[in-house]
A protein has these predicted regions:
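Short gly/pro/ser/thr-enriched loop/turn and capping motifs at secondary-structure boundaries
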Residues: 1-3, 104-105
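Active-site nucleotide/adenylate-binding loops and adjacent lid/helix of ATP-dependent enzymes
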Residues: 2-80, 89-93, 117-121
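A short, glycine/Asx- and small/polar-enriched loop/turn
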Residues: 32-35, 143-148
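Protein kinase-like catalytic core scaffold
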Residues: 37, 94-95, 148-151
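Short, electropositive, low-hydrophobicity segments enriched in small/polar residues
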Residues: 48, 171, 184
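ATP-dependent carboxylate/phosphate-activation module, predominantly the ATP-grasp catalytic core
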Residues: 54-57, 67-69, 74-131, 135, ...
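Cysteine/selenocysteine-centered motifs that mediate thiol-based redox chemistry or coordinate metal-sulfur cofactors
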Residues: 137, 181-203
Length: 203
C-alpha cells in the first residue's frame, strides 16, 4: 500500500535514506510559484497526467484542480539519464535488474542492461524493508552520479517482456511461486541492449 501513494513512497525513501527526490509534496502546500516542478496525481501509475509546471502562468491555471489529489515533485531536466528497474522478492529469494532506457510517449522503446552496485543495493533494501512478496517496478534518474528514485510501482511494468528476453523472468517466477511454491534460482542476465518495435500485420 505504501507505493500506491506517491507521497508515502517519498516518505518511505526519505525515512530509510534511499535516494529520494528533493521534494514530493501535496500541491496545496505550494502557495506561490518559485521553481519548475512535475505535477502528478498522488495516486496513479505510468506517466499519464504528468505535466511540467515551469511558469507562473501555468501554476495559476492549477487553481481549477482538486489540489488534494495532486502533488508537486522535483523536476529533472534532460541532463538526467533515466532507468527502469525491477526487484523481486519471493521468500528468501531476492533479485533485481537495472535497465537504462529511452522513452517515446511515456513508453520504453530501448533498454540496456546496466551493472550498478549502488542501485542494486538500494533495490534490495527497498524489498527487505517493505517486506515485499512479489515484484516492484522502480524508476529513477541519474546525473553526475546523483541517483534519484522518483517512482515505485507495485506491479508488473511494460518492460516485462524485455526483462523476460534478457533472462529476468519475474512474471513467470511470481506465478510459479504462488501456484507451486517454487523458489526461483539466481538468473543469468544477458548483458544486452534491446529494442521494442511495432509490427505491421495483415488481418
Amino acid at each position: 500500500k505504501i507505493f500506491l501513494n506517491k507521497i508515502s513512497t517519498h516518505n518511505f525513501l526519505h525515512l530509510n535514506k534511499i535516494f529520494h527526490p528533493k521534494f514530493s509534496i501535496p500541491l496545496n502546500l505550494i502557495k506561490k510559484y518559485k521553481d519548475p516542478f512535475f505535477l502528478k496525481k498522488i495516486y496513479g501509475h505510468g506517466s499519464k497526467n504528468y505535466k511540467l509546471i515551469n511558469t507562473a502562468y501555468k501554476f495559476k491555471k492549477l487553481k481549477m484542480l482538486k489540489k488534494d489529489q495532486w502533488m508537486a515533485q522535483e523536476f529533472y531536466d534532460n541532463k538526467f539519464d533515466e532507468y527502469t528497474c525491477c526487484v523481486i522478492k519471493l521468500d528468501n529469494f531476492i533479485s533485481s535488474i537495472v535497465l537504462k532506457r529511452k522513452l517515446n510517449k511515456g513508453m520504453t522503446y530501448f533498454a540496456e542492461v546496466i551493472q550498478n552496485r549502488k542501485i542494486e543495493k538500494a533495490l534490495r533494501k527497498i524489498a527487505e524493508i517493505s517486506k515485499l512478496e512479489g515484484s516492484l517496478n522502480v524508476q529513477l534518474k541519474i546525473f553526475n552520479n546523483k541517483i534519484s528514485i522518483f517512482e515505485i510501482n507495485p506491479r508488473l511494468s511494460s518492460t516485462v517482456m524485455m526483462r523476460h528476453m534478457l533472462g529476468f523472468k519475474d512474471c513467470i517466477w511470481w506465478i510459479d511461486y504462488f501456484l507451486n511454491k517454487k523458489i526461483p534460482i539466481k538468473p543469468k542476465i544477458k548483458n544486452r541492449k534491446i529494442l521494442k518495435i511495432l509490427e505491421e500485420k495483415f488481418i
